[in-house]
Amino acid sequence: HGNSQFYSHSLKLWEGMEQALNYNVMHSQRGIINLFHSDGQRDAYARRGNAMINQGDDAILLDREGCRKLLPYLDYEQTRFPIYGGLYQPRGGTARHDAVAWGYARAADRLGVDIVENCEVTGFGIENGRVGTVETTRGSIRAGKVGLAVAGRSSQVAAMAGLRLPI
């Protein structure tokens, strides 16, 4: 249930990202189809699709022929894992990851954020329950406010400041 709410909110954010950042992130909502290859996967995708529909998002459970109509170029006959069907999300899409990063960086710069590349955080100086300094491989940085944007190591860096992330 929580995943469908997260997905729904994410869709809305993606749909407004270029406007919010004033930057072309090459977002293209051409839809996404997650294929399933067993009855068990079909049942799981049916539950996911129903949760998405209950959340107000589009989701269509396709059988094999429905997939064949939308994806005629796939091999349906000589496959190791036969295609039983798919969950189609018409509003799903893609964006260029590098364009998203540049869009965020430019927006952050407009807000007065200094981004220091190739500079590893090694710890934080906590003063009165707040981060006062960021310790890095290039020395200490004093800061009135600190943002955390480190992708795959968010939990580890947050832990250096005594924070535990929910995801």
Outline where the language-model segments fall:
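Basic phosphate/pyrophosphate-binding loop/patch that engages nucleotide-derived ligands
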Residues: 50-54, 109, 163-165
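Short glycine-/acidic-enriched loop or helix-start segments at secondary-structure transitions
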Residues: 45, 126, 157-159
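Dinucleotide-binding Rossmann-like beta1-alpha1 core, especially the glycine-rich loop
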Residues: 1-73
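A short, glycine/Asx- and small/polar-enriched loop/turn
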Residues: 40, 71-83, 125-132
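Helical element adjacent to the flavin cofactor pocket in flavoenzyme catalytic cores
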Residues: 86-145, 149, 154
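A short coil-to-beta-strand element that immediately follows conserved catalytic motifs
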Residues: 27-29, 116, 166-167
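Glycine-rich beta-alpha-beta "Rossmann" dinucleotide-binding loop(s) and their flanking helix/strand
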Residues: 156-167
